[in-house]
């Protein structure tokens, strides 16, 4: 089997959430045949995994996907030269299956009928939900001032989700919640759950012991240019820091991730958070912390940062939004509250019972190992592809 995978960024080496999912999918697909991954941004991967080749759309080199104001809130409206190059690669490689990453690249699905290849739309999020969340996070004045524009953006995003899902032979979602959100937008065909992966399975060997959880050592990891994560850092600084300080105990919070915006730098300086930009090796950071605060209020999909923290043995302390779609049990697998200050108070209380914290960390690790390992993802992808029709029906 020959498999063509279109991605926004080069997934090798995987760093951010989207790259981590794309890389895991590529590895699973490579167990079934030759994989060519084609990206719109970044440079060609110097050493992709076995049975995977990588190249970029040369016409897009240096442009940046969202470098200019887009006429659409979620779709990258590809210039003619980019679309023509993608078409030529598709024709030359002659794949049996094409996997397209998310709505931004959904215009590529329009090429499928003339090539008669089976197609998969891999939805990392339900983008119309993310757009709605972003608008809901605006101030009341901003919502009123721009209500016509915001209404148009919501409608465009919903329509893009519906059309892309209808064009693809199969849609992959990372949670049952996202599958339900997509189905609520209109009729969809074959929707399959392909779970998000543990980014680095070596963290499963990090020790879990009571001593690790006595100290108030917290670590938040995420792409620091992504607005839901920026908001989470705000919640950590404004809501959690005062409660931790009021406990009278020493505490530390590390914020680490790619491409932090200036607002993140300012928040870390103001609230005494340690900022580590573009960390080279996450397991070291994770191994030094006992707790992972994840007070997310916006976004979709399932949080790779939750899986990563649990696999590494941290006690995850999260909002309902942060663990949405994962099937975790509050009080058993993680600490739960939708208020950042209350999350901090729960961490302080649990740190007084370090053995109970270790047991919660072990429960979280077991859950993600059983449901989000590379073996589990490969099994799900193999089954999904095996049950696709052999040829496009459209």
Segments predicted by a language model, with ranges:
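Short hydrophobic beta-strand element within catalytic cores of glycosyltransferases
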Residues: 305-308, 315-319
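Conserved acidic donor-binding segment of nucleotide-sugar-dependent glycosyltransferases
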Residues: 334-341, 349-354
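N-terminal subdomain of nucleotide-sugar transferases
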Residues: 1-55
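Acidic donor-binding loop of glycosyltransferase active sites
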Residues: 169, 287-301, 312-315
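Donor nucleotide-sugar binding/catalytic pocket of nucleotide-sugar-dependent glycosyltransferases
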Residues: 150-205
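Acceptor-binding helix/loop patch of EC 2.4 sugar-transfer enzymes
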Residues: 61-72, 119-159, 223
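A charged, aromatic-enriched C-terminal amphipathic alpha-helix characteristic of glycosyltransferases
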Residues: 76-77, 355-385
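Conserved catalytic-core segment of nucleotide-activated headgroup transferases in glycan assembly
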Residues: 21, 193-288
